[in-house]
């Protein structure tokens, strides 16, 4: 049976409880019997899902939202130091716990699988959660996105396995001690926290050093950054299992065959060929499934059982999620916000769509990312037949002088892309309705609130 409540976490208060990572931890604590409370900037389906579990969720941040008897205050790196609930916690002497420390405590006593990498963490974690659940292993899991319904990003299971995303953005993945660690890829991102690839490699090396004695590192064989990390950690003595299409991979991907919005994957593992279906399109998602397969095998689960169970995975919200179809136009939501992710999703859709036109509504995420990768984002958009580019979604950042979406638009046009800038999101449904024709695919793409436009575009198309 999974352990109970960590010490001093029986009455936690979460600042920003509606966030993907925070809400998952809050949900697991509530399911373990904690009296959970918290606050968030706005009302959401996630807040409602937490209330259904007995949590108290306040909208807005105010000192009075923090109960005097709270045993700890949980924060993420996105919470600013001047938050009034943080100030109140200091007055009351209530300890402040980072989200990553809270998650690490939840994994104590279990067999953790930590999924790391610049791209693909949510999908791979979800694949593991679904396949292990399908096999009756009742894992606990904490995912950075909902599987199929609000609040489905986390679960307290009665089994002894805990699957979690391991976030490198703020180095919080250094807090975990996994039995199995997955590294999907290693690239420069999160430019506010990392100045160079050497800093990125050093951070991932620290993560690998945290693998428990006798544990396993599952790492991509095809990705340049992952191969370099493998070279750097080989001397540490950790058991390494590589996967990919490279001939020297321990788990060798023999083929990935597109079948509409699905893929058939054939792998060679320990001399045995296995074939299974992944219910989302794209070679990158097929590789994520192979990483999940290798991680499960590292924990002693039969490969054939895992291969069959992976077919139960039907996707996660915002990862090439079909939102609907109107007037012969399908609208699909993509979380891609880094050029590598954008390219992978657009190539996947091109393989699935055949001759259909692909229209993209892209919202850049973060000024710092646009400053460093804006040119590459524009080049990725050249893979679409036409694109609408919105203003930058700031998230936690303040504006950077001179950094706007125009950097992306100029690069896209230089690469031959058809790009339309739109500054008012409210205009997007009409703009897309004027561009789209039956048979087209429309992708809303980005990590910000561009996802809200999918239903609005469908509504506008229904009135054509």
From Swiss-Prot:
Catalytic activity entry: UDP-N-acetyl-alpha-D-muramate + L-alanine + ATP = UDP-N-acetyl-alpha-D-muramoyl-L-alanine + ADP + phosphate + H(+)
EC number: 6.3.2.8
GO BP annotations listed: cell division; cell wall organization; peptidoglycan biosynthetic process; regulation of cell shape
Sequence positions that bind ATP: 117-123
The organism's place on the tree of life at top rank: Bacteria
GO cellular component: cytoplasm
UniProt cross-references to InterPro entries, sorted A to Z: Mur-like_cat_sf (IPR036565), Mur_ligase_C (IPR004101), Mur_ligase_C_dom_sf (IPR036615), Mur_ligase_cen (IPR013221), Mur_ligase_N (IPR000713), MurCDEF_pg_biosynth (IPR050061), UDP-N-AcMur_Ala_ligase_MurC (IPR005758)
The keyword Flavoprotein is assigned to this record: no
Broad enzyme group: ligase
Alphabetically ordered keywords of this record: ATP-binding, Cell cycle, Cell division, Cell shape, Cell wall biogenesis/degradation, Cytoplasm, Ligase, Nucleotide-binding, Peptidoglycan synthesis
UniProt pathway: Cell wall biogenesis; peptidoglycan biosynthesis
Stored NCBIfam families: murC (TIGR01082)
Family: Belongs to the MurCDEF family.
Protein name: UDP-N-acetylmuramate--L-alanine ligase
Protein species of origin: Streptomyces avermitilis (strain ATCC 31267 / DSM 46492 / JCM 5070 / NBRC 14893 / NCIMB 12804 / NRRL 8165 / MA-4680)
Gene field: murC
């Amino acid at each position: 049976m999974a352990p109970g409540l960590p010490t001093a976490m029986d009455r936690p208060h979460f600042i920003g409880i509606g966030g993907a990572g925070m809400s998952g931890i809050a949900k697991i604590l509530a399911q373990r019997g904690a009296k959970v409370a918290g606050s968030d900037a706005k009302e959401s389906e996630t807040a409602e899902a937490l209330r259904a579990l007995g949590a108290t969720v306040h909208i807005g941040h105010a000192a009075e939202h923090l109960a005097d008897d709270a045993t700890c205050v949980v924060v993420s790196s996105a919470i600013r130091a001047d938050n009034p609930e943080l100030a109140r916690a200091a007055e009351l002497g209530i300890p402040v716990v980072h989200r990553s420390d809270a998650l690490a405590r939840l994994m104590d006593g279990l067999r953790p699988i930590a999924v790391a990498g610049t791209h693909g963490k949510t999908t791979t974690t979800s694949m593991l959660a679904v396949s292990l659940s399908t096999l009756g292993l009742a894992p606990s899991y904490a995912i950075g996105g909902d599987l199929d319904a609000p609040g489905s990003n986390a679960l307290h299971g009665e089994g002894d396995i805990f699957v979690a995303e391991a976030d490198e953005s703020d180095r919080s993945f250094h807090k975990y001690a996994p039995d199995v660690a997955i590294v999907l890829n290693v690239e420069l991102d999160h430019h506010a926290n990392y100045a160079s690839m050497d800093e990125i490699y050093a951070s991932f090396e620290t993560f690998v050093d945290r693998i428990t004695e006798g544990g396993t590192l599952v790492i991509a064989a095809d990705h340049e950054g992952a191969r370099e990390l493998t070279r750097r950690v080989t001397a540490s003595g950790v058991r390494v299992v590589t996967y990919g299409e490279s001939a020297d991979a321990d788990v060798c991907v023999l083929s990935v065959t597109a079948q509409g919005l699905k893929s058939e994957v054939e792998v060679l593992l320990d001399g045995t060929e296995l074939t299974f279906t992944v219910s989302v399109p794209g070679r990158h998602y097929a590789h994520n499934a192979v990483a999940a397969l290798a991680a499960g095998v590292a924990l002693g689960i039969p490969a054939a059982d895992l291969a069959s169970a992976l077919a139960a995975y039907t996707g996660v919200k915002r990862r090439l999620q079909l939102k609907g179809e109107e007037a012969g136009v399908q609208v699909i939501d993509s979380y891609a916000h880094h050029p590598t992710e954008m390219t992978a999703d657009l190539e996947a859709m091109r393989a699935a769509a055949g001759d259909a036109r692909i229209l993209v509504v892209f919202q850049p995420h973060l000024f710092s990312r646009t400053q460093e990768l804006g040119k590459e984002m524009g080049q990725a958009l050249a893979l679409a037949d036409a694109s609408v580019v919105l203003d930058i979604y700031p998230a936690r950042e303040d504006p950077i002088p001179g950094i706007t979406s125009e950097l992306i638009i100029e690069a896209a046009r230089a690469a031959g892309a058809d790009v339309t800038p739109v500054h008012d999101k409210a205009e997007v449904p009409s703009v897309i309705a004027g561009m789209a024709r039956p048979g087209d695919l429309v992708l809303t793409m980005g990590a910000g609130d561009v996802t809200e436009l999918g239903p609005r575009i469908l509504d506008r198309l229904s009135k054509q």
